[in-house]
């Protein structure tokens, strides 16, 4: 969101020695699948130096993301030099300086007018072209990392692809018959793994230091389910490369208890490896610079690096922010994300390991059987370790774990507990116990609530989020609670439809407790669009129309290396 009444459209005079420049029009066109990466990627925080810091703290933009998505009209180094030379001159205007030298981004879907006489489903299908970006061209002055194939973005301020969002968007694309677009997005993710070594948070340079919940294997499985298993084989190398990214450093961990490096953790002496969220940087996020910086300034210098690292790791989790990650649920400064073993992350990696094992076995080349056995064993080791560490028999629920002590966070139950059900690694008894508590405490008039704590953060009560609704609904269905799954589905779809009829919008999150209140919390206004909301709504609506999902019962978690798809 930009402020200032459209001031950026005016070329204002600035008392500086620099020469004014004019904007050029950006276009997109179809490009080769072997799209090269720019030789020097534009990194706003690094390349603009003091100008970046000053703009982000100035309040020129209400949203820190606006400036990092803006395109410099001349070389960033020249802009930085101009600023250094002219910023102390009499009458200097920072706002005017930025207006002359940057092309500012516009929200996705701006100008789209909703026809509320359409059904919600028809509205969503009409939005797919609005939310779809054509293949990118290489632009060394953009923070956008170009992708070679079309892709769907969430909408609003989110003008780029987002990793875990895309799985839930794909559910709706498949329900719309758009497996071609799903394939394009899978090809883009494989391209990112091949060029930058992992799937970043989003295709922006400022997201490169972290990823997001690793749903790539689930995407491949869903695509294969919608087409055929052979369609998954081209992604096997990328799946293994992504797994290596998440397991980087595992071989170098000492055998003792409580060892960690980047995203890998050895919980107990001689025990298997589990994973945590991480970020390779420990400074304020460029896209949320002002709020990060201002909170950091309330801490002593010795605590800031750890705070920023935890902020970034929380962004990698996708749950930014939530009482789930804070020692004090009311104090963001107490984030401890890097000290936690998340139950959902390890469920995802279990599924990825089983998927790789299954695809290796399916392909059947020389050596594949041995590799399949290795990954199947890794998955089983992870399953056993996670069930032992994260499941609390007394309360019948899964919790995140403080890896330094092995303590389960039993005072912080969240919808992350549904992930072991969705991915089929919980025992039948555990699945029944978790489902019972979800029904008893988390099911609200509009669906499942994210946590039981109202902290003011957006990933807390009273909010419900489309990805968590899907995982929870289908997780309890997988463990025999079809009636509960159907009830939650109908409540969520009812809330989606009610909001759509009242506002003409599909939003990124909803208040599931007070159905008349717009969801709140977070660092930015609730966004319209919205990719994962659309995807989950279409998939659930299609499921309701067509009857139960074909995979509705527990499959043995010790199953062999057959192809694995998500439920």
For the regions a language model picked out, list residue spans one by one:
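Bacterial N-terminal signal peptides that target proteins for export
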Residues: 1-11
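N-terminal Sec signal peptide cleavage junction
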Residues: 18-26
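Extended glycan-interaction surfaces of carbohydrate-active proteins
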Residues: 47, 51-160, 184-190, 196-199, ...
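Alpha-helical support elements that line or immediately flank enzyme active sites
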Residues: 162-192, 416-428, 469-482
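Short glycine/serine- and small hydrophobic-enriched flexible loop segments
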Residues: 171-175, 218-225, 351-362, 422, ...
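Extended, well-ordered alpha-helical scaffold segments
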Residues: 178-189, 230-247, 352, 365-386, ...
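Aromatic/His-enriched, Gly/Pro-containing loop or helix-boundary segments
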Residues: 193-235, 527
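Long, repeat-rich segments with strong aromatic
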Residues: 335-363, 375, 458-483
């Amino acid at each position: 969101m930009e402020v200032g009444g459209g001031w950026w459209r005016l070329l204002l005079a600035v008392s500086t020695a620099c020469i004014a420049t004019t904007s050029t029009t950006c276009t997109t066109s179809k490009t080769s699948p072997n799209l090269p990466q720019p030789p020097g990627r534009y990194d706003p925080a690094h390349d603009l130096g003091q100008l970046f810091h000053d703009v982000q703290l100035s309040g020129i933009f209400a949203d820190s993301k606006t400036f990092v998505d803006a395109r410099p009209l001349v070389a960033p180094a020249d802009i930085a030099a101009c600023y250094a030379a002219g910023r102390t001159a009499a009458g200097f205007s920072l706002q005017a300086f930025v207006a002359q030298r940057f092309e500012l981004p516009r929200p996705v879907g701006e100008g789209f007018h909703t026809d509320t006489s359409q059904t919600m489903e028809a509205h969503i299908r009409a939005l797919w072209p609005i939310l779809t970006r054509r293949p990118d061209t290489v632009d060394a002055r953009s923070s956008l990392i170009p992708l070679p194939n079309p892709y769907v973005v969430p909408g609003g301020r989110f003008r780029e692809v987002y990793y875990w969002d895309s799985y839930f968007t794909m559910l709706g694309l498949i329900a719309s018959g758009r497996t071609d677009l799903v394939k394009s997005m899978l090809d883009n993710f494989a391209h990112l793994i091949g060029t930058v070594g992992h799937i970043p948070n989003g295709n922006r340079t400022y997201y490169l230091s972290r990823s997001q919940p690793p749903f790539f294997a689930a995407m491949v499985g869903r695509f294969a389910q919608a087409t055929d298993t052979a369609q998954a084989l081209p992604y096997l190398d990328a799946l293994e490369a992504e797994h290596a990214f998440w397991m980087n450093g595992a071989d170098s961990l000492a055998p003792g208890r409580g060892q960690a490096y980047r995203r890998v953790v050895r919980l107990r002496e001689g025990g298997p490896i589990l994973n945590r969220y991480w970020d390779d940087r420990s400074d304020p996020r460029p896209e949320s610079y002002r709020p990060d910086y201002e909170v950091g300034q309330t801490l002593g210098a010795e605590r800031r690096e750890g705070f920023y690292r935890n902020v970034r790791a929380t962004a990698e989790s996708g749950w930014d922010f939530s009482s789930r990650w804070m020692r004090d649920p009311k104090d963001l400064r107490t984030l401890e994300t890097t000290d936690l073993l998340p139950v959902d992350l390890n469920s995802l990696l279990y599924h990825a390991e089983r998927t790789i094992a299954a695809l290796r076995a399916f392909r059947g080349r020389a050596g594949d059987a041995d590799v399949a056995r290795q990954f199947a064993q890794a998955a089983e080791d992870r399953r056993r370790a996670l069930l032992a560490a994260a499941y609390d028999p007394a309360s019948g629920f899964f919790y995140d774990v403080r890896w330094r002590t092995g303590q389960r966070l039993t005072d912080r139950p969240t919808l992350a507990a549904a992930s072991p059900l969705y991915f089929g690694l919980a025992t039948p008894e555990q699945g029944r116990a978790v489902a019972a508590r979800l029904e008893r405490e988390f099911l609200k008039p509009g669906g499942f609530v994210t946590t039981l704590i109202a902290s003011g953060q957006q990933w807390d009560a009273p909010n419900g989020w489309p990805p968590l609704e899907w995982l929870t609904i289908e997780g309890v269905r997988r463990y025999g609670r079809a009636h509960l799954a159907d009830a939650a589905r109908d409540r969520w779809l009812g809330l989606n439809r009610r909001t759509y009829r009242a506002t003409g919008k599909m939003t990124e999150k909803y208040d599931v407790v007070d159905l008349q209140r717009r969801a709140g919390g977070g660092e930015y206004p609730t966004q319209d669009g919205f990719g994962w909301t659309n995807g989950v709504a279409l998939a659930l609506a299609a499921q309701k129309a067509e009857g139960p999902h074909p995979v509705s019962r527990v499959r043995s978690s010790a199953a062999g290396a057959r192809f694995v798809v998500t439920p």
